[in-house]
């Protein structure tokens, strides 16, 4: 396979940490060390910055996540807060600020039902917020299972179950029981910090994880949907892998690496066999921090320490 660069999206004044598509694939959100969130969209056939959100955070914005309805955008920051933005046509307004974490909030994520928002932090905790009426957010649970900085939270695409990744080298899964949220599974095969997670397509999707030692693992369930096991390993990267994104329409896996490259892997026969499809060797001039496939699978967005957001297309 071949991929080519479609567009350079310039505007951030510091490293770009994260990119995320809205559910319809019409808006790409990016965030970075300049404390801003930028929203990109098509205008006259070109991708341009449609809006800049500057007044939500006092420090680096580390993560962004869209609700499934597309009306809300959450942003997590090193200032210890998570900001909720409401979309009204082409404008975004801050409608809530979530406080409680003792340190930097590294990531945030909406549940598929829209009932919950998860946040994770350097303070080693995962918070699960219940979304109430009138845009009110109440902390439903604080999970303290991890022994180190929690880097990523990601909800299962079809049910309200949560995965988290940590500096303690583990991945943990959480579900709601009768009176609280519980950790029901821990994956401990990684030998270094787990940076990123991405669920695949299908009725019982697999999970991809990436780590500081260059490893990318694929996990699956057999029979018991709450019993996860390692079922595949991708070619080891030469530097840390900071993010992974699974294309839910075409099945490709993209990785963001500390060697400035973006790689795309394709399935090679069975469910757990993968081969390298293509390498974008100098996708960025510095570390690549984030990759995200558009919902249609036609575009791949990447973000790096060089301050650029880039869009790539399959030739």
Curated annotation (Swiss-Prot):
Keywords: Repeat, WD repeat. WD repeats lie at residues 11-50, 56-95, 100-139, 145-188, 189-229, 236-275, 283-315. Essential component of the cytosolic iron-sulfur (Fe/S) protein assembly machinery. Required for the maturation of extramitochondrial Fe/S proteins. Belongs to the WD repeat CIA1 family. GO terms for cellular component: cytosolic [4Fe-4S] assembly targeting complex. It comes from the Eukaryota. Pfam families: WD40. The lineage of its organism: Eukaryota, Metazoa, Ecdysozoa, Arthropoda, Chelicerata. This is Probable cytosolic iron-sulfur protein assembly protein CIAO1 homolog. The keyword Repeat applies. GO terms for biological process: iron-sulfur cluster assembly; protein maturation. It comes from Ixodes scapularis (Black-legged tick). InterPro entries: CIAO1/Cia1, G-protein_beta_WD-40_rep, WD40/YVTN_repeat-like_dom_sf, WD40_repeat_CS, WD40_repeat_dom_sf, WD40_rpt. The keyword Iron does not apply.
